[in-house]
Amino acid sequence: MRFSFSVLMTIILVSLFSMTSPFSFTESPKGILDRVYGNGDDEGDDDEGRGGEGNDDEGRGGEGDEGRGGDDDDDDDDERDSRSFRFNDDNRNLRRLLDSLLLQERDNDDDKQEINVEPKTYEGYGLKDEDEKSNEDFNFAAAGDFGCSENARNTVKNMEDKKPEVVLPLGDLSYQSTANCWFDVMAPLKGKIMITLGYHDVSDGEAKLDQYVKGFKIDKHYYSYDYNKVHFLVMASESNFQNGSKQFSFVKQDLEEASKNNDINWIVVTIYRPLYTSPSKHTAEESMRDLYHPLFDKYGVDLVLQAHNHNYQRTYPLTYNPEKASNPVITNGFTTGYNSNNDGVIFATIGTGGESFYGLDGRASFVATQIDRFGFLNLEVKNGNPHTTLTGTFYDNKGDEIKDYFTIKKEIK
């Protein structure tokens, strides 16, 4: 372990406060540093918590609306890396100081890696067989918040082992000033990728955004495509999505057409910010949820894949509750098997690509399972007759273990 000035100061501060402060720590300085810098033994423990719905008031007009206003990595929030620290409430100021020192150390390392890096042009990464109309079975894989660490490379390697035909990165792809490292990490999956853009992808400079736009030949940040009887709709949470916007009109028309298309068995939506979430660093994007979940119900969306919170969560099938939107209607309370013809939407948060963990502070009542592990969600489509099935399996990078499994079955059109 490398001890810089910031780390040394952290140890001193922790030691002094633990000896002299009337408040207590439940974790040693070494434990804190091990959690922050990693000792190889604590990649993330299952944390299923004590309940709650994760819809705090943070934003620009809704109970849990986060807003667009600041860089997510620089937020002041006391919830940053909650699994790394365990303090009493009265130690908030010390916690902020320790956070600042440790995060400054990480940022300094990132800056050193980014000296004189010029954005490169990458081609051939986008899905080659877009609008494929065959009836063959296939699988696709999804995760967000990759970054460029060894954790991200492990996620990509494990994805590659499952031989997906389509790969869905769900936003916040690179946390550096360019996307060079991320394209390099994703190289084994070249020709299979259809991206969703997140906060860091559109807000960290035009040069990086331009790499994505040109590399994947997307003229808008929202778009749709078909593959083997699955309709994929990619939404842009970082663009204007309000009622009356171009994106809203596009989404409404796109879903209406897909719902009437007899060649489409499944509708899958990808979006960066979560519309539903257990308590974690980020709350639900409520204004977007209240506008679009009713559309998802109306037009028969089956699955919504989202990221932003660096953990894995998967809800029961849900329909929108206009009386209390933060408490959606659970249409099927089973944890793994669903026999439904568009009776509720499953929302899966997969911010597990490899950047970091945020931890989970309890579990919302509408969440069937949640996991603090790096990994990805593999989804297998079997187009049988008279039924078709969509099976989701979350694979943990640690030993390729199965941590979640669910199947949706419905009659074909």
State what each model feature region is.
Residues 105, 109-181, 278:
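N-terminal active-site segment of His-dependent metallophosphoesterases
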